[in-house]
């Protein structure tokens, strides 16, 4: 070797020879008897000498020797330790030095197909050989370390001063580099285990998938039927198999059954290798079961049978050779190596016999040539267990490989599970509301509150603490302005094909200047022609199942609980012409205003009545005597006609009432004494006047008490509105009560008006609502104080309304018109007309117009005999001087009406009728009022959705129709004019001109409200309210409170009052919550199922600032050795919940924008109210490009809070839907169910003319969420929202967004197709690698998104039922009265501890 000359640090030839000699001896001799220590010390020593000698030379001259040294060291240590792990059972380790040069390695397998010889007329089979081609997958392992410059100088003795300090520093540098090198090379050992574990996981499908696939017989392409059947079994297995070790911790037999199923569903390897693992008795190990340390400990504690505690493992690996271009022709049948001495001899070239003082496994005693080449094994500690009929190596790498490495253990993962809970649902069928024992969960009070509609849901959080969600928690969702966002919905509906439908009920016409009876007669003649078919809005008799059926044409317009959508003539301003113009149809929308207008199938009568019972609890109830008297009066078909005549001429005026006080007293007393019924209960003004002026002995005490009881009940109903309203400042000049209940809204008027009070207060109401009024076809009205005999005009056609004389004060010319009564009077009158009268009449009343031009002359035709002043007035009709004596009963005189009613009135009382001529009524006038939504519902979209309500000025309400009274039947004084469905009894229409039998039948099905008095979809009182009145079976007290509950408004601001005061708003919610859990998995792999190739290690180093960096890279590759799935995994145990499983409610004010309210103070109030008491505090609005970042609470107790989102749904929803896994939309979605057409995915999700594929008897469970552009769809569908629904913050996002649904369903479809394809017979030209199918990860990490279903947890609307259910009572009821229990049907069933 030549001498190298350098300016410094000259190396002599002798030193160079010594250095070369060091590299010729790869392993040093240290008398330890341990070959590993020998290799380690020798390698370190050579590295130190290497650095010391070549510091002044170029490092690249010696890189080859250094790389060989590190590579030899790394390979030796790597496989000596790796082969002792249980993972080595599943692989065949092969040395492949040329791996770095392989680009496309291919391996071909030959598999012989078994045969069965059969008898009979079968074709004779011949041997079949299948050839399968597999390609190797290249990988690599890399690690790095650095040597600082200071350490290099110490190692190379560049600066040596010969002191002890210098020697100490040099030893410290040597030790530090040795530690670094050992750590780096140890990382290769751990990396090999981690890499192979990852390889096995990549080809291991979930047990829940593989087990059903193996049992599914059909091969090849799966049609829709086969896919659906397979999916059904797959979903069942996912729920049953997940967390089986946690769920059945006390049932080892069941765990053993799952494990046996797990090890039996894989296919054995095609490789028959001499290199294998056995127990100490020589039985081969069939596979390896890898798990976590916790699960391993549990399995060894009585679940699995331990077969052996040691195993004989091979301490060798094969070699690879190449023939041709990158073709792997020999797999593992290479040279076998015997023990550690062979490793040292063949790998390190240690040939000196003196150095081989290494203990080795003794050779086998059989020296036969057939066994001489068998590999020698080493005995290592192992846990060999019996699973089924297989011997399995039980391994846990969590601590041996991954501890303190900052690398996650692959068998510890996370899973997201979405939970679904119904809140506020009422079981509409009375047969579903039962209790087995009267004493179950009994309460102290007489009225069991469990009969009332549920308003909350109880469940357990992660710590087993009872947690509750109430309807109030939904304020952050339902009280958001997104409830009013229907602009895009209307645009979408108008783009659909629309057929011209029946416009009756959706069209408001202008009135004319003709008299009201003429207009009504004209309407009735043309009414039938206006309806080519029955309108859909009258079909309130449908059951919930019929309503949500695909055949219901009304279903596609049921998109939002707060709106009615309907087909109407386009481009027509309302009110329009008398007949709807021939225009292209369009879709319009109106606010439902009150919750009573929600269709009866979606908010059934049984719910309304049950809510009424709750509202009336502890409040005033009418006595049985009152109920009987008033009920009999409303049903009295012989009710005196004279009472209607007197009521009309009094026309609500207090002065007129006082003038007729004597006559009215005799009438009321006479009617009571002869029938025990009460007169004038159809008129609120008369009720008030009677209780005021006739309560001091004028009437019998029992009789007057009935009037007082009625009025007291009206006041109790009024107080109920106050009780369910949070008192505070109003908005835009409207009080809180006016924003909460329609009966306290000044813009809403009573059906009968006797004076202009309501119109005056209405004009003084919120100007922003643009209140308008049309009288006799003209805009506005003119009020007169009064008219008398000299100034009356029965043929008046203008818009003049007679206000009436006040009881006190002047009414001269120029005196302004002022109200006779305060606002409270008007509220009470509306309560009486819209609640009390309908409750007693049950649809048998009708509003009537009065022919005053005939009535006043009839009143003049009264005969009062003259009595001398010195004689007493007669007291009985038998006296000839009495006005009702037979001689005085002249035909067509007023005396006859009193006589026919069996009433006894005296002459003085009759003479008081003359006092009415000073304040007369002229006509009954039709009034049409309209207004925009109140401040709580006013947006840019809804501001033009005006409400039109009709009323009669100087009309009256007629009770039971008197068909045999000629005066009534012929319409002599009165004619029917229905103003809304509550007062549209078809019997009363008989007096109208042209009323045929066909029209009478039609009137029983469709309320004949003339268009100039409003239309169903534009009115405040709509068909659902009228249907409730006529079909309710509850008592009168309950019905009054039930009707009151239906008049609460349904707007964001009104819902804040109702939900905070415990009022059920008439809708329910689907609660959706997503939680994350840490899981522990089991992995089973067959013996020798994977070939693992190890290439030559490569060392790269480069100088860096402050030292030298070394990077070690070793190529690896692997190939599967099976013709089927040779590995399987299972999510076996629940490690811990990562979220709190709590009740944190979503607040849309902090997560998304919404349509702006027209009044900013409303938005701020909603934001403040919904945030009060919540966990998120409101913040000031941020710039447009900044999100709303609410201030969170100062502390947190149970981990990450999981957010609960609320999906509005009908209160009559079928509870059975929520007892199993279901879709929060209420309709199954998924490409898996569809056919081959691309449009099928759209049809599956949104085409509600087709049945739900999961429930073929209906189109959907929740039309407000499953239909396209419905309320729930607009709220949670990420397609429409840029800042709204989010896959990160919204658990509903993946169920409502079509792109997410399509992606998940495509994944599921591919999962099943590929899993089935590889489970079937393989063809000869395929390159199946038997990887876990795409979607397996989603199946184990997010099964709810994959299957598009959420799981119901254990929850109940009543805490007592929940405690009984988890206590394990046999046969515990799922229903108790109106309360319900939902049993846990999620994978977590039985996994989390519950309180005892």
From Swiss-Prot:
InterPro entries: Herpes_MCP (IPR000912), Herpes_MCP_upper_sf (IPR023233). It comes from the Viruses. It is found in: Virion; Host nucleus. It holds the Pfam family Herpes_MCP. The keyword Metal-binding does not apply. GO terms for cellular component: host cell nucleus; T=16 icosahedral viral capsid. GO terms for molecular function: structural molecule activity. Transmembrane segments: none annotated. Keywords: Capsid protein, Host nucleus, T=16 icosahedral capsid protein, Virion. Self-assembles to form an icosahedral capsid with a T=16 symmetry, about 200 nm in diameter, and consisting of 150 hexons and 12 pentons (total of 162 capsomers). Hexons form the edges and faces of the capsid and are each composed of six MCP molecules. In contrast, one penton is found at each of the 12 vertices. Eleven of the pentons are MCP pentamers, while the last vertex is occupied by the portal complex. Belongs to the herpesviridae major capsid protein family. Homomultimer. Makes the hexons and eleven out of twelve pentons. Interacts with triplex proteins 1/TRX1 and 2/TRX2; adjacent capsomers are linked together in groups of three by triplexes, heterotrimeric complexes composed of one molecule of TRX1 and two molecules of TRX2. Interacts with scaffold protein; this interaction allows efficient MCP transport to the host nucleus. Interacts with capsid vertex component 2/CVC2. Interacts with the small capsomere-interacting protein/SCP. This is Major capsid protein. It comes from Varicella-zoster virus (strain Dumas).
């Amino acid at each position: 070797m030549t001498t190298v000359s350098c300016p410094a640090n000259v190396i002599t030839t002798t030193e160079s020879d010594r250095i070369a000699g060091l590299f010729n001896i790869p392993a040093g001799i240290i008398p330890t008897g341990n070959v590993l220590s020998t290799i380690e010390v020798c390698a370190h020593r050579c590295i130190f000498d290497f650095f010391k000698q070549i510091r002044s030379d170029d490092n690249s001259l010696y890189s080859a020797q250094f790389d060989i040294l590190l590579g030899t060291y790394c390979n030796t240590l790597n496989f000596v330790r790796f082969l002792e792990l249980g993972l080595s059972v599943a692989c065949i380790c092969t040395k492949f030095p040329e791996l770095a040069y392989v680009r496309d390695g291919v391996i071909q397998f030959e598999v012989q197909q078994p045969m069965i010889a059969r008898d009979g007329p079968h074709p004779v089979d011949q041997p079949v050989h299948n050839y399968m081609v597999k390609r190797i997958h290249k990988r690599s392992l890399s690690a790095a370390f650095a040597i600082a410059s200071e350490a290099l100088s110490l190692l190379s003795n560049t600066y040596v001063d010969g002191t002890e300090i210098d020697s100490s520093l040099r030893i410290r540098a040597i030790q530090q580099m040795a530690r670094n090198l050992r750590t780096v090379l140890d990382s290769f050992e751990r990396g090999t285990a981690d890499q192979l574990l990852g390889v096995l996981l990549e080809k291991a499908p979930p047990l829940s998938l593989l087990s059903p696939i193996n049992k599914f017989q059909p091969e090849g392409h799966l049609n829709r039927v086969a896919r659906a059947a397979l999916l059904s079994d797959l979903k069942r297995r996912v729920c049953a198999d997940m967390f089986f070790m946690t769920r059945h911790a006390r049932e080892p037999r069941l765990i053993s059954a799952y494990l046996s199923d797990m090890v039996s569903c894989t296919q054995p390897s095609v490789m028959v290798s001499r290199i294998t693992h056995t127990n100490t008795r020589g039985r081969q190990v069939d596979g390896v079961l890898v798990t976590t340390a916790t699960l391993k400990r549990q399995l060894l504690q009585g679940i699995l049978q331990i077969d052996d505690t040691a195993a004989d493992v091979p301490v060798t690996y094969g070699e690879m050779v190449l023939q041709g271009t990158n073709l792997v022709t020999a797999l593992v049948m290479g040279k076998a190596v015997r023990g550690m001495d062979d490793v040292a001899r063949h790998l390190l070239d240690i040939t000196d016999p003196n150095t081989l003082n290494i203990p080795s496994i003794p050779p086998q005693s059989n020296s036969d040539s057939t066994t001489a080449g068998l590999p020698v094994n080493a005995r290592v500690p192992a846990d060999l267990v019996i699973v089924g009929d297989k011997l399995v190596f039980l391994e846990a790498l969590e601590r041996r490989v991954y501890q303190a490495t900052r690398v996650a253990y692959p068998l510890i993962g996370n899973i997201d599970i979405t939970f679904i809970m119904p809140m506020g649902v009422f079981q509409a069928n009375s047969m579903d509301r039962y209790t087995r024992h009267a004493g179950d969960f009994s309460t102290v009070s007489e009225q069991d509150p469990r009969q009332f509609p549920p308003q909350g849901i109880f469940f357990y959080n992660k710590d087993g603490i009872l947690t509750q969600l109430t309807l109030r928690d939904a304020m952050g969702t339902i009280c958001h302005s997104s409830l009013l966002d229907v602009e895009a919905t209307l645009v979408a509906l108008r783009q659909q094909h629309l057929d011209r439908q029946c416009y009756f009920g959706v069209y408001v016409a202008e009135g004319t200047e003709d008299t009201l009876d003429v207009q009504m007669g004209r309407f009735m003649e043309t009414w039938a022609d206006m309806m080519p078919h029955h309108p859909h809005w009258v079909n309130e008799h449908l059951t919930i199942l019929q309503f949500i059926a695909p055949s219901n044409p009304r279903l596609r317009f049921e998109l939002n609980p707060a709106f009615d959508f309907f087909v109407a003539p386009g481009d027509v301003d309302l009110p329009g012409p008398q007949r709807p113009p021939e225009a292209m149809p369009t879709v319009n929308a109106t606010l439902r205003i009150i919750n009573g207008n929600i269709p009866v199938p979606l908010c059934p009568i049984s719910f309304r009545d049950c809510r009424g019972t709750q509202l009336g609890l502890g409040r005033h109830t009418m006595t049985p005597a009152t109920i009987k008297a008033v009920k009999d009066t409303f049903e009295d078909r012989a009710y005196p006609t004279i009472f209607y005549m007197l009521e009309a001429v009094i026309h609500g005026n207090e002065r007129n009432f006082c003038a007729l006080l004597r006559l009215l007293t005799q009438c009321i007393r006479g009617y009571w004494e002869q029938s025990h019924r009460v007169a004038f209960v159809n008129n609120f003004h008369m009720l008030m006047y009677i209780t005021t002026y006739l309560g001091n002995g004028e009437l019998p005490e029992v009789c007057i008490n009935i009037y007082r009881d009625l009025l007291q009940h009206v006041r109790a109903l009024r107080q109920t509105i106050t009780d369910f309203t949070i008192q505070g400042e109003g908005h835009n000049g409207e009080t809180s009560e006016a924003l909460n209940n329609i009966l306290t809204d000044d813009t809403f008027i009573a059906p009968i008006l006797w004076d202009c009070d309501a119109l005056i207060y209405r004009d003084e109401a919120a100007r922003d609502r643009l209140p308008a009024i049309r009288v006799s076809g003209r805009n506005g009205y003119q009020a007169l104080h009064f008219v008398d005999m000299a100034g009356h005009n029965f043929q008046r056609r203008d818009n003049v309304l007679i206000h009436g004389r006040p009881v006190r004060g002047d009414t001269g010319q120029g005196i302004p018109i002022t109200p006779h009564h305060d606002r409270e009077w008007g509220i009470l009158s509306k309560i009486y007309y819209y609640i009390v009268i309908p409750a007693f009449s049950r649809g048998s009343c009708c509003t009537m117009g009065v022919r005053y031009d005939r009535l006043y002359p009839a009143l003049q035709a009264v005969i009062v005999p003259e009595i001398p002043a010195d004689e007493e007035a007669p007291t009985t009709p038998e006296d000839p001087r009495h006005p009702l004596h037979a001689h005085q009963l002249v035909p067509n005189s007023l005396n006859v009406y009193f006589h026919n009613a069996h009433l006894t009135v005296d002459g003085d009382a009759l003479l008081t009728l003359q006092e009415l001529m000073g304040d007369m009524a002229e006509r009954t006038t039709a009034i049409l009022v309209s207004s925009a939504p109140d401040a709580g519902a006013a947006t840019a979209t809804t501001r033009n959705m005006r409400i039109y309500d009709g009323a009669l000025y100087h009309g009256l309400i007629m009770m039971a129709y008197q068909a045999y009274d000629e005066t009534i039947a012929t319409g002599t004084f009165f004619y029917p004019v229905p103003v809304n469905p509550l007062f549209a009894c078809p019997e009363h229409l008989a007096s109208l001109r042209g009323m045929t039998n066909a029209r009478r039948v039609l009137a029983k099905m469709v309320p004949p409200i003339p268009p100039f008095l409003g239309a169903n979809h534009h009115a405040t009182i709509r068909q659902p309210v009228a249907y409730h009145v006529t079909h309710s079976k509850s008592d009168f007290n309950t019905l009054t409170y039930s009707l009151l509950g239906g008049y609460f408004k349904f707007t964001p601001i009104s819902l804040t009052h109702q939900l905070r005061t415990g009022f059920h708003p008439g809708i329910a919610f689907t609660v959706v919550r997503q939680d994350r859990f840490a899981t522990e998995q089991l992995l089973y792999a067959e013996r020798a199922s994977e070939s693992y190739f190890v290439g030559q290690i490569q060392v790269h180093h480069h100088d860096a600032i402050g030292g030298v960096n070394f990077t070690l890279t070793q190529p690896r590759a692997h190939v599967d050795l099976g013709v089927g799935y040779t590995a399987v995994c299972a999510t076996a145990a629940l490690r811990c919940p990562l979220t709190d499983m709590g009740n944190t409610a979503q607040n849309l004010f902090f997560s998304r924008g919404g349509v702006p309210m027209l009044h900013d103070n409303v938005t701020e109030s909603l934001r403040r109210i919904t945030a009060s008491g919540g966990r998120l505090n409101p913040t000031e609005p941020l710039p447009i490009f900044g999100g709303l970042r609410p201030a969170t609470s100062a502390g947190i107790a149970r981990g990450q809070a999981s957010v609960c989102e609320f999906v509005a749904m009908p209160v009559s929803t079928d509870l059975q839907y929520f007892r199993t896994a279901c879709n929060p939309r209420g309709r199954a979605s998924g490409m898996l169910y569809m056919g081959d057409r691309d449009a099928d995915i759209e049809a599956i999700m949104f085409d509600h003319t087709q049945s739900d594929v999961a429930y073929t008897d209906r189109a959907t469970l929740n039309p407000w969420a499953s239909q396209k552009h419905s309320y729930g769809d607009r709220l949670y569908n990420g397609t429409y929202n840029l800042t709204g629904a989010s896959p990160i913050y919204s658990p509903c996002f993946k169920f409502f967004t079509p792109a997410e649904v399509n992606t998940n369903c495509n994944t599921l479809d591919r999962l099943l197709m590929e899993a089935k394809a590889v489970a079937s017979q393989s063809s000869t030209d395929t390159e199946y690698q038997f990887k876990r199918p795409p979607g397996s990860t989603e199946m184990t990490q997010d099964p709810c998104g994959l299957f598009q279903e959420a799981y119901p947890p254990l929850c109940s609307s009543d805490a007592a039922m929940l405690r009984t259910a988890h206590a394990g009572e046999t046969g515990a009821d799922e229903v108790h009265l109106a309360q319900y229990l939902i049993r846990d049907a999620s994978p977590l069933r039985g996994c989390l501890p519950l309180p005892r």
